[in-house]
Amino acid sequence: MPIDKDIKKVLIIGSGPIQIGQAAEFDYSGSQACKSLREEGIETVLVNSNPATIQTDMDMADTVYTEPLTPEIVSEIIKKENVDAILPTMGGQTGLNIATGLGDLGLLDGIKVLGSDIQTIKDVEDRDLFGHFMDKLNEPIPKCHAVESVEEAIEAVKDIGYPVIVRPAFTLGGTGGGVAYNEEELIEIATHGLDMSFINQVLIDESVLGWKEFEYEVMRDKEDTCIIVCNMENIDPMGIHTGESVVVAPAQNLNDRDSQALRDASIKIIRALGIQGGCNIQFAVNPETGEYKVIEVNPRVSRSSALASKATGYPIAKISSKIALGMTLDEIKNDITKETPASFEPAIDYVVVKIPRWPFDKFRGINREIGVQMKATGEVMAIGRTFEEAIQKAIRSLDMGHDGFEYVEYTEDDLANPTDERLFQLYSAIKDGMDLDKIQKLTNIDKFFLYKIRNIVNFENEVTEEKLNDADFLRKAKQMGCSNKRLAALSNQTEEYIRNLLNRFNIKQSYKMVDTCAAEFEAKTPYYYSTYDSGNELKSSNKKKIVILGAGPIRIGQGIEFDYCCVHSSLALKDEGIETILINNNPETVSTDYDISDKLFFEPITFEDVMGIIDQEKPDGVIVQFGGQTSINLAVPLANAGVKILGTPYESIDGVEDRELFAKLLNKLHIHQAPYGTANSFEEAREIAERITFPVLVRPSYVIGGRAMEIVYDNNELEKYMKEAVKVSPEHPILVDKFLEDAIELDVDVLCDGEEVFIAGIMEHIEEAGVHSGDSACVIPPQTIPEHILNTIREYSTKLALELDVKGLMNIQYAVKLDEEMVYIIEANPRASRTVPFVSKAIGVPLAKVATWIMTGAKLKDFNLTKEIKIDHVAVKESVFPFLKLPESDTVLGPEMKSTGESIGVDENFGMAFYKSQLAAGMDLPKEGKIFISVKEQDKKKIRPIAEKAANLGFELAATSGTADAAKGVDIEKIKKVSQGSPNIRDAILNKEIDLIINTSEGKQSAQDGYIIRRLAIELGIPYVTTLSGARAALNAIEAVQNNEITVKSLNEHIDGE
């Protein structure tokens, strides 16, 4: 059936910044939707405020907006662009909330809603409507009451009984949810949940804790044809959010009867809802009786549908987009086989395992338990012929230094109340001989999975050097998924020894295809996974070919920005007719889409796994510049193995990581650096700190995202850091730098071809020095730096890029002391940085593509990139933080990175651009009301001008007595600290009397008062800033929005002046 002729122009709503519960999977789905609609001749308009996405590239949609995602702003875009329809189902929970918001405001008259209509969204998101709907279908759901007050919640439990699951309606990743075992817990969780909910509603669910959880991905078209794309089994039982659970596909523990029952229910539900496109349905199954209940229906593409797409090779988002236009499944071709229609259900003859990646390494001291609220930032996926092989590959893919299962300390309580170490604790308990029945009782994990882990334990117990010299035993070890490093550790040998044994016995990886059809039809666009079974399906060509190493799972410090660069690199090579081979293991991202590269390998990014591919493909070179620290860490071992590293010489990469070599280089170039030292012990660190004077910045060498980095102000803090945060040794020294107080930091991205340097972007940080560059807001062009200082920065950047023989991208961070007119270099990274997508969007140049072309021999002059581009607009990048999902975390920013994603604001002036960036990041700055101010001692001398400006903008002011005294002459109401008794600032915040909070803190050991204030701001959604520079920028933004209407302008208009 042809597409709906009334639809000529469609607005695709993106999901906004990466956050816990809503990550790269929606860039993947949105990008697929853009491509899919354009293939059918539809004009596409995209709105998404995340600059790090592929979908916000100007060649992805006909028109791209990076405006904040609010119903009011999206409605302005709908009016301006005169679209016929909107597609909200590619934008996650954000997309659905925008659609329902537009509908409720009456702003969708005459506009078609594609995929799932507004009533369908409400039928599944509003729990009362969902309950009635399922009752009509005779489908069982857990008893549930939707309540709008704590009193109603207490009443609901009388019908259901404890324990209950408390979940806010219309939220993401279980935000604000929890399990209540008694009334006290119920009151606490329900109060918080009501504040979190988009519609001020909390769901009180009957507990099915301990039941098994299964998910079904279903597709339906307008002719009522339905297929099951994939079923998946959560290894963890109900009570652990599916985003927190280890997941396996296909489901391993469903008998034919139960499988058919869940399949029938899935098809019945999608038909009754009338969804056209993809839908995710979650079931709980009682392990004793086989009874099932429907837990949730997502009428949109989701994290699970991205996983199902990558696990099967069936592009759910792409096909959903075509169905939304009116096409039917039998009209849509399967892109992998090019023969079968999309109405053929995928068949898989392998096992897929997904493991979440948590951010607990960045938030020391917080509760690591996993449960109904999502905390993971990303995930990895691995494919094997057996569960044992797939799970061991997935563990390696996490990029956390694990070469396989590892023994950890645990208690029975840990097994009953799982943390991020769940898999290792299971392994350790089995290794210690704990009875599997007991483990099953404590964990509610199906014995099937416990047997599988026991297989690995038993096999490892047999490993000795002697046994490994038996070819059959060694082959079995590899078929179990054991890495060379793990086998070396178990046999007290080296990785090289194991590699030599494998060569001697001619035991090599064979590569199998993901082809959607279990090899029934020939795959035209295959992707591969490794195994040690017989039969290699990899066909190597004689073309020129290049390997690109991906960035692995999304984590704090290494986000979607690096995947963006990998995608651009692959597309650039394809443009040149070079065969591209991409290695990655992240199921959420665009880079692991089957049509981005010529060959995709879903593999761990380790030396062993990468070399396996290189040995068989024999590429002309490997690009390590774009995969963050994950791929950079492989540069030296790969080069030592004789692999050609393209672009910047690996000696230069290593040279800037080595402090002594880098210092010598800077001296040679007459570039200033803050005083520093390298310590191998606490005594050495203390001597350095006393020589260069406190405060000092301390950190381990070789890190990304500032992991375990702190500013310390005295010897006591230094000693605490050395004892608690790091293990120091001659192999792992500590870097001690003089901390430059009151400096302004800048980031510079440059392109270099070895002869010329192009300054792509100089970004001024909004936050003061000491806040990690990945957490600070930044602006292009710089707003407060004099031209002669900028010229010094340009000169330093050019000298450094040429001296290091950079071929491609480099990022350099500077600190400027304006009072001394001094420019200091903080660090240089001869690779793509997390700011590359932002700068690319701000100036309209695809930096990662150009960097790739340079690596293959092009020159900057070929692209007319010899002069810095002057832009007429202002672009601001703001960071987005996971504090709401991590209840014990403090919002104070420092040298260790905490943000998960970013937003962009673009306008003609700084104030409005900053306002848009804040709104896009979820910080709705007030135009009027009351501002509370409380600042640390050293900020008091600078607070008066800020207070004056706030008063002049018409705000009432309240402050603690010390801060109020420091701003003498400004009308400020004095308010008690929490520790001084009531009524105090906590009462004022809880009574919703405060509209903006300015609160700066005394370094690491922030006062309890400050923590309470900042935490309350997060919980209640009150805008807050934790630095004076942030406060100045916020007031500039408020002034701009008080005096001007917010206008919408596409990126195309900003860049091309259209």
Curated annotation (Swiss-Prot):
Q: Which cofactor does it need?
A: Mg(2+); Mn(2+)
Cite the residue spans of the region called Allosteric domain: 925-1058
User: Where is Mg(2+) 4 annotated to bind?
Assistant: 827, 829
The segment annotated Carbamoyl phosphate synthetic domain runs over: 539-924
Residue numbers binding ATP 2: 699, 738, 740, 745, 770-773, 813, 827
Residues binding Mn(2+) 1 are: 282, 296
CC cofactor note: Binds 4 Mg(2+) or Mn(2+) ions per subunit.
User: Domain of life here?
Assistant: Archaea
Where does the chain bind ATP 1? Answer: 127, 167, 173-174, 206, 208, 213, 239-241, 282, 296
Query: Per UniProt, what is one GO molecular function of this protein?
Result: carbamoyl-phosphate synthase (glutamine-hydrolyzing) activity
> Quick one: which residues bind Mg(2+) 2?
296, 298
Record-stated family: Belongs to the CarB family.
* UniProt-recorded name of the protein: Carbamoyl phosphate synthase large chain
Which organism encodes this protein?
Methanobrevibacter smithii (strain ATCC 35061 / DSM 861 / OCM 144 / PS)
Gene from which this protein is expressed:
carB
